[in-house]
């Protein structure tokens, strides 16, 4: 694929080496030259084969400084028609909207009693990464606590089919320290949630990029 002159110019700023996280974040700031506030992204390649269930990751992490993105939270429950902090609350009516692929939310939380109904909507919610799960904290009886966690900056992540984890860890108008703190939280969470089936070298590569830039590879041994 032919890259733009802008992209090629940014590539020329990146040396063929592994950067310390602090060096990488300083450089990342220089790469954020788009005319909008770009997202800071982490792309982590792990030595996992996700076709095996004991080599899959699906977990959550609370970013100390959040993602910088306002999210719309929907709750599916029969317990109440109004829940503080939720943008949408419903039960069968909200499920009917989802069945028609009407998705007006970024995060979906459900009470356990609604899961049999939601299971039928897996083909719609699954590909969008919106299917509630106990592992992600989105199937719970304590809905208020779950909402607060996501408002504080909790995000869900998982390995894709090739064993890579993709996450947003902030915006490029965050200062370097806040981006670093969020990045450390991600690394620690991925380490803590290492699957039982993982063997040998766990970390294959760890790269960061803006939404419009080439990636910078990190030396994951240099975390201070």
From Swiss-Prot:
GO terms for cellular component: chloroplast; large ribosomal subunit. GO terms for biological process: translation. This is Large ribosomal subunit protein uL1c. Binds directly to 23S rRNA. Might be involved in E site tRNA release (Potential). The keyword RNA-binding applies. Belongs to the universal ribosomal protein uL1 family. The keyword NADP does not apply. It is found in: Plastid, Chloroplast. Part of the 50S ribosomal subunit. Keywords: Chloroplast, Plastid, Ribonucleoprotein, Ribosomal protein, RNA-binding, rRNA-binding. Its main location: plastid.
């Amino acid at each position: 694929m032919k890259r733009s002159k802008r992209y090629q110019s940014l590539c020329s700023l990146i040396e063929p080496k592994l950067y310390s996280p602090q060096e990488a974040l300083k450089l990342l700031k220089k790469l954020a030259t788009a005319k909008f506030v770009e997202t800071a992204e982490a792309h982590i390649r792990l030595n996992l084969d996700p076709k095996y269930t004991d080599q899959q990751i699906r977990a959550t992490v609370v970013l100390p400084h959040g993602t910088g993105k306002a999210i719309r939270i929907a709750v599916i429950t029969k317990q109440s028609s109004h829940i503080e902090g939720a943008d949408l609350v419903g039960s069968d009516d909200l499920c009917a909207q989802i069945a028609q692929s009407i998705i007006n939310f970024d995060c979906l939380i459900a009470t356990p009693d609604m899961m049999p109904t939601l299971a039928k909507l897996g083909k719609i919610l699954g590909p969008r990464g919106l299917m509630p799960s106990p592992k992600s904290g989105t199937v719970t009886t304590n809905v208020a606590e779950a909402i607060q966690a996501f408002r504080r900056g909790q995000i869900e992540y998982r390995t894709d089919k090739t064993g890579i984890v993709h996450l947003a860890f902030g915006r490029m108008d965050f200062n370097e320290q806040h981006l670093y703190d969020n990045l450390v939280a991600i690394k620690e969470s991925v380490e803590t949630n290492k699957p039982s089936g993982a063997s040998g070298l766990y970390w294959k590569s760890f790269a960061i990029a803006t939404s419009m830039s080439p990636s910078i590879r990190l030396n994951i041994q240099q975390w201070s």
